[in-house]
Amino acid sequence: MTQDFGVYLVTGAEHSAGRSTAEVVEAAIRGGVDIVQLRDKTATARERYEVGTELRTLTRDAGVPLVVNDRLDLAAAIDADGVHLGDDDLPIEVAREQLGSDAIVGRSVSTPDAAREAEQAGADYLGVGAIYGTDSKDTDPEQSNIGLDRIRAVRDATSLPFVGIGGVTPDNAAPVVEAGADGVAVISAITAADDPEHATRRLADAVEGVAPNV
């Protein structure tokens, strides 16, 4: 696929300092975000739908893809561009069958073997981590702080585009791309920033400064 993955925002209302998810996403769009994932583990189904509908309008107007974490039903209901799946979610093949051949289907992995399996199953892209460790998500200790060597190993294992996630900030994003990632995925580096637009722009500058993986 030809989608840019330079700066990938995963929403996190709990980190947004009282701002709405839509406000943060709108600021990130101004800052140059490439793709947005709607993720909210605490909201009700109705709340997720309402936020998703609002984000769908914002992202579509800006030409930025929107994917939904885990929930195929929500992705279909808001006409999202795709879905991002984890270890405990439905298989990639099922997501593809439900959402169609044009849907973007991503998969979280932490090892080269998992990357190969996801590619064989038909994933479009991968999220690899947690690279530096993170407080934004509950991560299995064995999948935390995997480091840049693991990014290099995953790059050797798959031809799929992938983003590195986990503790990424504007100050440490460049080495992730230098190690082989096509971009970086962040939650709090944007959502918790005093100025999400500026934080997004700093991340974009860091990633874009490390061609040719972007």
Curated annotation (Swiss-Prot):
CDD domains, A to Z: TMP_TenI
Sections of the chain in a coiled coil: none
Residues bound to 4-amino-2-methyl-5-(diphosphooxymethyl)pyrimidine: 37-41, 69, 108, 137
The protein, known as: Thiamine-phosphate synthase
A GO CC annotation given for this chain: cytoplasm
UniProt organism field: Natronomonas pharaonis (strain ATCC 35678 / DSM 2160 / CIP 103997 / JCM 8858 / NBRC 14720 / NCIMB 2260 / Gabara) (Halobacterium pharaonis)
Task of the protein: Condenses 4-methyl-5-(beta-hydroxyethyl)thiazole monophosphate (THZ-P) and 2-methyl-4-amino-5-hydroxymethyl pyrimidine pyrophosphate (HMP-PP) to form thiamine monophosphate (TMP).
UniProt remark on cofactor binding: Binds 1 Mg(2+) ion per subunit.
